[in-house]
Every structure is written in C-alpha cells, then in structure tokens.
Amino acid sequence: MDRQISDDSESRFEAYVDEVVSVIGHADRVGPLRDYCIGLMMPCERKSVEPMAAVTAPDRTAAQHQSLLHFIGQSTWSDEQVLAKVREMVLPQIERHEPIQAWIIDDTGFPKKGRHSVGVARQYCGQLGKQDNCQVAVSLSLANHHASLPVAYRLYLPEEWAADKQRRHKTHVPEEIRFKTKPQIALEHIRAACAAGQPRGVALMDAGYGCNTNLRESVSALGLTYVAGILPNTSVWVAGSEPLPAKPWSGRGQPPKLLRRDETHQPVSVKKLARGLPKHAWCNIKWREGTAEWLSSRFARVRVRVAHRDYKRTASRPEEWLLIEWPEGEKEPTKYWLSTLPQDVSFRRLVDLTKLRWRIERDYQELKQEVGLGHFEGRGWRGFHHHATLCIAAYGFLVSERETIPPSAPRFTTFLKAPAIPSSYRPRGSSAANRTARPELDCHDATTSDRGARQKTVEMPMLHN
C-alpha cells in the first residue's frame, strides 16, 4: 500500500507541475520551474537556490545554480497567474469536505541582517515576537475546517523604502509600487479575491487589522461579513444606547447634522463593558478538537455599535456583535472581537468561526518549516515574490495530497528522493583547504557521529495533520 501511495503521489505531482508550467510562458522556463518546485519538496535543511541546485542537478551544480538564480530573480513570469492556477487546482480538493468558510488576513515576518534586502526595516516580527530587523509580507488565505490555502501574498514596503529611490532601484521595486499600510494591502487582496469570484467566506483578522475602521467598513461594503480582533480600549455603545442626535436647528444657517456626545452621554471601552457583565453572560464553549483534548474557553457576547469618531457622522453605525474571551483563572479578558455575522448566529458558531483564524498560522508554520518560505537569500522584489509563489505552489500540492491520501495511510508518506551529491561538490566560497561541504548543503550528511551510516537516498516526508 505504501509503495502504491508513493507512486500515485509522484504521478500526481508530475501532473500538478505540468499545470503550473502551462501559465509561465517561455519554454526555457519549464525546466527551472520544475527543478525549483522539486527542490522545495526535497528534504534539504535550506531551500535557497544553491542547495536546491545541488540536489536537483548534482552533476552540473554550477550551471543549475545560475539557471535557478535567473529564473527566480529575473524571469518576468506572473506570480498572479501561477497563484491563480494553484488556486484552481487546490481549492476543489479543499472543498471536498465543506465549502470555504473564511478569508483570513494576516502577515508574517522574516528576520534579516543588514539593510539591503528589499523592504527590510526595524519593525514588529511575529516570528520573533518583538521589534527587529525583518521583512514582512501580507497574505490572504481561503480556509475551511479541514485545510487552507494562501491565495495572495505581497511584501510590505515600509515608508522609508518607498521614498528611497536608490534602494528601490537596486532591488528593482516596480515603479507602480507605492507605500501602502498593511491594512491597505490586505484590502487590495480582498478586493482582488472578490473580483476573481472566489468562494466567499467570513473575513477573519487579528487586532493588527481589525482595529482599522476603514478596513472593516470596506470589507462590509464588499458584501462580506467579518470577525475582527480589536483592542481593549475600543469604544462602543451598548445596545439600547447611541450618540445624541444633532442639535435642534436654531432657524439660522444650515441645520445641524452631526451626532453628539456630552459629559453624561459617552461610549464605553470594551474592557469596561466586559468587566461589568453579569456572571450569567459568560459561557464555556468548545470549538475544536486539539491534539489531546477539546479546546475550550469562557466567552460572552453582546450587541454594540462602534463609536469611533461617530461625532463626525450623521447616523449611528449599525449594531454588530462584540465577542469577549475571558479564560478561567485570568485576571481580565484576553481577547475582543467585533463581528457582522447575523444577529441570529449561534454562540458556538460565532466562536467556531472566530477561532478558525488558527488556519493561517498553520499555513505560515508549514510554509516555513516544510517548503522554505523564509529561505530566500536574494535581495530583489521579483525574487522575493517568485520564491514565495512557488513555495505556495508546493504547499498547495501537499495540501491537496492530504485530501487525497486515505485516512488509513501511514502518518508520513514519501515520494521524492534526493540524489546523492557528488563528493567533489563544494559550495561557493568554500576554501580549497576545507574539503567538507557545509552540512546544510549535503542532504545526506549525518550531523552527529552516533546516527549510523549515511544513507544513499533520503525520502521526503509529506506534511501531515
């Protein structure tokens, strides 16, 4: 059975790559694209160009290195067309279990040294959990409870970069690229997905995006519902209260139109609102089976109107849900969300969709750990996006395989073997005196002496649930 699964997977992989190849144009790009995708699926520690050249063409590594460098860094094929083809092939596999439930917006960071890689700046890096030198990309994933797939991906170009003509020129940032905030990039992703007719889902975002009122209102204007993380100081009107109407007209000038507040009529922060809720408002809800037990926490929900600058508006905003999480044992609530899901949505459904955002975290984890999303070593705009696009293509195949391989199959399934690297191979920059290649370039090198004899071939484990 294992051998049959492996053979079938290899056959499907060949057909999958053939479809991706069909949208890249020139025939001279076919070989490099195949090899790059294969390299991303190989069991190398590093998925940058040099080690992938060594494992995909061990007898002509130097020539392969140059070929892959040109293909990933300079070739003008369309990232959007490749991602569209991947989406076309993979989404039907994901939807075999259930329709798409969510559109998940988030960003991911890549720690970097120096200042010359495109978009690198001192900014918050989620991978490190702190401010540091890094690149950040904003993505959109389509998800259901079984799987998810990134369908849009773009580097965030900090304002200092967008205004620096010299650095833009050196890294070949396209002329049309201007500074945009991360929420603005996210909105572009969402608009493009709507225009492409992608299967609709609830837009999910954390507080880094959800606190942006314009983003939330723009998502609603596109006909999408959302669940958006917010901060504890977000101000709202509790159901049954709202801003004061405009002042009575005095009979002179234009009649007043703007809503009002006064000293005794003010909105409340969601944190204060949560602390004042009665005990019966809180409910323990389970939302997903974890590795050892069901995940659960304590939640409350209330209907509110967002108060953000409504004194500059002529009408109150519509009511929406405020969802609050306050785990047992915590001194105060830990998370808050606003949601435009229908008023009759069940409590459990609201929590379930809110927590589905974990899917994009799974995407990022596996894109980085399994197919080398963060391993690109070039400095240019095009190479950064080409590498990410093919990482998503490789990941898309692995996602579709999860939906194809029967549940009774072993936890790991292998189908690609890395060829042995010639003993004469030396990575660029190594000294003639040092006759040992760097460990990360030799996919078969045992890193410690007690691991036993070196194997002739190494098989790549498939991703697993």
Where do the language-model regions lie?
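Hydrophobic alpha-helix feature that most strongly marks membrane-spanning transmembrane helices
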Residues: K355, R359, K368, G372, ...
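Active-site-adjacent bridging/hinge elements
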Residues: R115, Y364-V371
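Conserved nucleotidyltransferase catalytic core and NTase-mimicking acidic/glycine-rich helix/loop elements
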Residues: L398-R428
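Short, solvent-exposed helix-loop connector elements
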Residues: N214, S339, F347-T354, Q369-H386, ...
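An anionic, glycine-rich sequence signature occurring as long contiguous blocks
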Residues: S11, H146-T171, E175-F179, V227-L231, ...
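Conserved, well-structured functional cores that handle cations and Mg-NTP chemistry
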Residues: D2-L204, G208-S235, E242, W249-K271, ...
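Hydrophobic, well-ordered secondary-structure elements that form the walls
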Residues: E361, A393
